[in-house]
Amino acid sequence: GKAFPTFAYGCIVAEVEVDMKTGYVDVLEVTASHDVGTAINPALVKGQIYGGIVMGQGFAVTEDVVTGKRGQKTKNFDSYILPTSMDAPKMNINIYENQDPAGTYGAKSIGEPATEGVGAAIANAIFNATGRRVYENPADLETVLLGHKLQ
């Protein structure tokens, strides 16, 4: 059978700067190109992609859910760091319209596709900057400089 009536395609590329003394990853620029079917409201489509980039940036470099024997330890925004508009990188958005016969008015989904590739793009940019692969999120001091979390 067919799992989905249609598929959303996109490509995301990130540019980062990594401080090799602290492991701090600064996401400088993200370019996202997405086939959105018919962009019924192009401004809202771009807004969704902007939000998805910042959300993916959070997953990749700042947000960390820490748990222990007694449950979740990160219970407030002092320890669970969400990116703000001040943390947002320069963003370049490219919308490609390719009317989808299965989509309402020819549109495709853009909510999840806008977020899904950002972490991988940032991880690949970290690899290009440092020569080290990041396999865990967030990309912090331990994962960037050592390749794993300290126990």
State what each model feature region is.
Residues 1-151:
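C-terminal catalytic domains of large/alpha subunits in multi-subunit enzymes
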